[in-house]
Amino acid sequence: MAKGQSLQDPFLNALRRERVPVSIYLVNGIKLQGQVESFDQFVILLKNTVSQMVYKHAISTVVPARPFNVTGHQNAQGGYGPQDDVPSGE
């Protein structure tokens, strides 16, 4: 799995687990809204009144509608949440 997905997967999984409403902005400017139902390496299944399969390569930004907890879990690729950052020497 690509190194760039070490934060992406826990982020999307937390959105899915906590059923956080999201706005997904596509590269062409279209805004989609709903909840992340599932996802894989290439697509996100977004559920609102209908389910939409959104290809990740078409996504610009994912904006959660409310705060949620994505921190505190090391994933299989070794990624960490912000509270696990290496101290800056202070």
UniProtKB/Swiss-Prot annotation:
RNA chaperone that binds small regulatory RNA (sRNAs) and mRNAs to facilitate mRNA translational regulation in response to envelope stress, environmental stress and changes in metabolite concentrations. Also binds with high specificity to tRNAs. GO terms for molecular function: RNA binding. Keywords: RNA-binding, Stress response. Homohexamer. It comes from the Bacteria. Belongs to the Hfq family. InterPro entries: Hfq (IPR005001), LSM_dom_sf (IPR010920), Sm (IPR047575). Residues 71-90 are annotated as: Disordered. The keyword RNA-binding applies. The keyword RNA-binding applies. This is RNA-binding protein Hfq. One of its GO terms (biological process) is regulation of translation, ncRNA-mediated. GO terms for cellular component: cytosol. Residues 9-68 form the Sm domain.
